[in-house]
Amino acid sequence: LLDLVYNDFNYSHAGYYTLIDVARHFGFYCKVLSKVIANWQEFKAFIDKWAARAYIEGFVFEDANGFMVKYKTPWYKNWKQARGVLQQVWTGRDIDAIKNIKTKLAFEPRLMDAIPEFVEECREQGRGTCPSVIELRNWFEN
């Protein structure tokens, strides 16, 4: 459970501890409060520490006034972009043409080079639809 938003004209949502209670009541997993950050330096240190770690999609930060902002990690951005590349390669687009456009995958160039091989393996196995990025990730990371 990520949030409970009230049905009103002004955005408002339940507090964190109410969220925990509701999640527990219904048997849902609930987001985890990682840290209370007091200032910009602590915020930057938090991002620097966690941004490079794999398998973390991102964080939602909320200030004392209820303003929320979402931060997506490079790991998440890489795999999100890989999904688009996978779909393009599946439909027959040349990987070199994609590389000229999708330079942001440069921090994981092995992934860019592996996608055509993955697509070929899927086709050889008789697959008729584009595989998911989760299937690509499982294949790539194993």
Predicted regions and their residues:
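Core nucleotide-handling region used for phosphoryl-transfer chemistry
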Residues: 1-142
